[in-house]
Amino acid sequence: MSAEPSRNPRTPPVSAVDIDGAAKRIAPVVTPTPLQLSDRLSAITGAAVYLKREDLQTVRSYKLRGAYNLLVQLTDEEIAAGVVCSSAGNHAQGVAYACRSLGVHGRVYVPAKTPKQKWDRIRYHGGAFIELIVGRSTYDLAAAAAVDDIERTGATLVPPYDDVRVIAGQGTIAVELLEQLNTEPDLVVVPVGGGGCIAGMTTYLAERTANTAVLGVEPAGAAAMMAALAAGEPVTLDYVDQFVDGAAVNRVGTLPYAALTAAGDMVSITTVDEGAVCTAMLDLYQNEGIIAEPAGALSVAGLLETDIEPGSTVVCLISGGNNDVLRYGEVLERSLIHLGLKHYFLVDFPQKPGALRRFLDEVLGPNDDITLFEYVKRNNRETGEALVGIQLGSAVDLDVLLARMQGTEMHVETLQPGSPAYRYLLL
């Protein structure tokens, strides 16, 4: 699924000149990140595929670029009043690092459910210049507390994406990749959350290249930019899947939306499901040794679901690498489901000896494994329900497995990914 903005160009909120200026401002602090050719992705697509490694940025994401570009332009009065942001992730770390670098005091509001290791990283980057304020239960409440703060204290709010200084800062990634590539790419693939990064990069590429196209990639469960383009304005999503947390926003920024509509048909938006993102994460780790967070792997996941012109030059932005190692169990699970290797069933077992053994002998194939078995014995009933997870040796074995199940006396219900029962019992 993809969508394109209006083909009636408008004036973007920032310009290439603004972005060039931002590149000069942030140069003392921001690390130029590598642009690396991926032999694997090049072989798969038939194109020359490069990875722009913002996961190797100082705070392990591109967010420092926009935060620093905003803070470095504050007036003396604004510096004295300090800055405020609300974030549970990369934006907070970028703001914290920029505050310490410039000697600006800041307050970061984070939801109470934020993992402690993220608190620790924010404190590490900000040092004595950052006050971490924890307490509100959700991000929306933390954001509301930040707004209350600036109204009460006169501090400057540092938005994660809906600010021209932030957009210009994120756009410096495009400045860098053009210098490193030394030619015009045919396609640049960018993850999309609130839209600040794709807005800045698209604006710069629109002015500084002749024929470069931009593909924005959103998680299917948080497709806020696609919804905005379809509606003709930013809209608020009723539900957002939080798994790809770095891109899980319910409404894109007004300024990023304006930048994309101004770019016309050079930019398009596509979505990928969260399982494809997990598969891309694991492939990047196992093949390139890249530890990408879910949002950081969006571009590669989108690339692999897009028809690419053989012989073309493509750049994929790996936007961040702040991943929690404790999430890898869920990452692997979602990837196996996406690849058709993991399936779940509700099975009514006869409550008599040998029922499980018969299931193993009659239903399971030689390369299939039971990965989950939760059984509840019922008194005064002839059958008992079990939740059964099966991992196949190959995705093509599913039809054979289902046929064997139908040939038994047991009633079997396949749980479909995305259904309410599936989400309740499993993910």
Swiss-Prot record:
SUPFAM superfamilies in alphabetical order: Tryptophan synthase beta subunit-like PLP-dependent enzymes
Function: Catalyzes the anaerobic formation of alpha-ketobutyrate and ammonia from threonine in a two-step reaction. The first step involved a dehydration of threonine and a production of enamine intermediates (aminocrotonate), which tautomerizes to its imine form (iminobutyrate). Both intermediates are unstable and short-lived. The second step is the nonenzymatic hydrolysis of the enamine/imine intermediates to form 2-ketobutyrate and free ammonia. In the low water environment of the cell, the second step is accelerated by RidA.
Pfam family, one: Thr_dehydrat_C
Family annotation (NCBIfam families): PRK08639.1 (NF006390), THD1 (TIGR02079)
PROSITE patterns the record matches: ACT_LIKE (PS51672), DEHYDRATASE_SER_THR (PS00165)
Official protein name in the record: L-threonine dehydratase biosynthetic IlvA
Top-level taxonomy: Bacteria, Bacillati, Actinomycetota, Actinomycetes, Mycobacteriales
EC number: 4.3.1.19
Residues recorded as bearing N6-(pyridoxal phosphate)lysine in the entry: 63
Protein species of origin: Mycobacterium leprae (strain TN)
